[in-house]
């Protein structure tokens, strides 16, 4: 074991983050009643510049008046390269009550970006006497962001989650695609006349997972733009879950059930994990460090793998 300990991530479900524009308050009650673990009320890309101020008012009113149940309630502010973000933070922290759980910071390119928001939030919390600290989620959406992903992950104790914003990331990287997540038409190798598709987002997602797991942060898969393609959404979500991500964005209500389905361990997976733990307990009682389970070797590392699945299932059911 390394001298550097890997802290656990926040113990809360984050299977689905449902997004809705702050300029469409008619959607808020439906979002509050949804099955999403996290609701992201948006002030950024889905809101036109002339609508920013009203969207901010809409969100503050909704935070203070609607019943959000057990939802983890997050607001995506505008980017630090805009004239809107500071007013987003000030008004949210001064006017929205303690029901606000999280601020999502878009287009983060370095640790200083997180520090800037943290400093402002901390000052307002102290001035207003807020007793519940607001957490952060950041979105990696640029070449600079992925290049500095680990320093970003270590930037603030408020940081609880990190996502990849595929569209802006693709533009920053100069990628020849207009898709938002998913398989890209020309990203394949040709062998004996057959196309072998690959995943252009995999390397960036893997970097995010590694940085998040190192620093005790929840790694979350970003958007899948084609909300008419359920199987495409499931495929990308399964890949992300296998990679170590805990959930995925939903940009349409129909994607909520899909995300919850994929990121909830199946009964079969949980039963198998419990059987592996039981098999290893029996092996330990015999003085053995490994045993055979259904024809394959399991050992001490298998205990850790099985515990991941069991803990996730227990947290969701609770």
UniProtKB/Swiss-Prot annotation:
Divalent cations such as magnesium or manganese. Its EC number is 4.1.3.24. It comes from the Bacteria. It catalyses: (S)-malyl-CoA = glyoxylate + acetyl-CoA; (2R,3S)-beta-methylmalyl-CoA = propanoyl-CoA + glyoxylate. Its cofactor is Mg(2+); Mn(2+). Substrate binds at residues 19, 24, 30, 76, 167-168, 251-252. One of its GO terms (biological process) is oxaloacetate metabolic process. SUPFAM superfamilies: Phosphoenolpyruvate/pyruvate domain. Mg(2+) binds at residues 141, 168. Pfam families: HpcH_HpaI (PF03328). One of its GO terms (molecular function) is malyl-CoA lyase activity. It is an enzyme of class 4 (lyase). Keywords: Lyase, Magnesium, Manganese, Metal-binding. Homohexamer. Dimer of trimers. Belongs to the HpcH/HpaI aldolase family. Involved in the ethylmalonyl-CoA pathway for acetate assimilation. Catalyzes the reversible condensation of glyoxylate and acetyl-CoA to L-malyl-CoA and the reversible condensation of glyoxylate and propionyl-CoA to yield beta-methylmalyl-CoA. This is L-malyl-CoA/beta-methylmalyl-CoA lyase. It comes from Cereibacter sphaeroides (strain ATCC 17025 / ATH 2.4.3) (Rhodobacter sphaeroides). The gene is mcl1.
